[in-house]
From Swiss-Prot:
GO terms for cellular component: nucleus; ribonucleoprotein complex. This is ERBB-3 BINDING PROTEIN 1. The lineage of its organism: Eukaryota, Viridiplantae, Streptophyta, Embryophyta, Tracheophyta. Expressed during tuberisation and in roots, nodes, internodes, petioles, leaves, stolons, tubers and sprouts. It comes from Solanum tuberosum (Potato). GO terms for biological process: auxin-activated signaling pathway; cell cycle G1/S phase transition; regulation of cell division; regulation of cell growth; rRNA processing. The gene is EBP1. Residues 1-49, 297-387 are annotated as: Necessary for nucleolar localization.
Amino acid sequence: MSDDEREEKELDLTSPEVVTKYKSAAEIVNKALQLVLSECKPKAKIVDLCEKGDAFIKEQTGNMYKNVKKKIERGVAFPTCISVNNTVCHFSPLASDETVVEEGDILKIDMGCHIDGFIAVVGHTHVLHEGPVTGRAADVIAATNTAAEVALRLVRPGKKNSDVTEAIQKVAAAYDCKIVEGVLSHQMKQFVIDGNKVVLSVSNPDTRVDEAEFEENEVYSIDIVTSTGDGKPKLLDEKQTTIYKRAVDKSYNLKMKASRFIFSEISQKFPIMPFTARDLEEKRARLGLVECVNHELLQPYPVLHEKPGDLVAHIKFTVLLMPNGSDRVTSHALQELQPTKTTENEPEIKAWLALPTKTKKKGGGKKKKGKKGDKVEEASQAEPMEG
């Protein structure tokens, strides 16, 4: 196969090199999450935590593929966000922001890394206190974790996206929680964080997606967000939005000099992946970004909120649909949970959890170190899954 033909062929998991790049990106983002968690202490500034996560990813990816002839793009695939309590997502404030985390806060950490455009994302929920998590906080995290475990077992060749949407809603209901509307799980491809195959969190008349079947050698970002509230989050303040992605298919002649300046900087620095306004020349950024968003040159990732007092949990993971089964490559162990609800009397949920993630190989192929594949059904709902 000539180089040109190879370029044209879409790179997927049939290439061992591609699998390695996904797993390397996953290893880095898992470590970045661990680092940010270790820095989450009462009174820590959220912006400092976010910057530490991004800096670690940049440093670690920068050390890879240094000596190859062809330049390999690598770095942050989604800026580190830390969304607290009833804030649902995308909180990654500017350097001037003084918001801190407090004892007892429910922290949702979300981040992504890529190597050569092969993306690994992770989302995790942590309560900032010692000892087991109890009450409704434990319920909402257990609901999210159990839904993630069920999704892992249903995102497999032959199953449909609608199967996952229905199942995760049933899991959340068992814990008297709601899956949050508007959260999408996407197929990912090289340099594409939000591919065309989509899993809805909640199916309703307002949000329709094409029915799709999962196929071998695909990669998905599975994104589960659960709330003790009504699961219909609102945008409260557009000024909180700091994460954007360039819309590569749109063009417009910007009128303002500040907009042209900032869009030129974005096109050079962040042509494809989502980025944070923190990484732009901040004084001009605010002014220029508005016109870019108004004319759809940039897709904003808004900061959404449930009602005050609602608790929101988030788990996101990357899964590779390999020929021998599903390989969850990003995760982090949860704290001990003592939920008030259980799925003990939910045979359908128990049956989903009993599904294996790996297909049994004849003659037992080489096994990698401790993936908890087929044993999750023995664990309680509160048990974390380490990937």
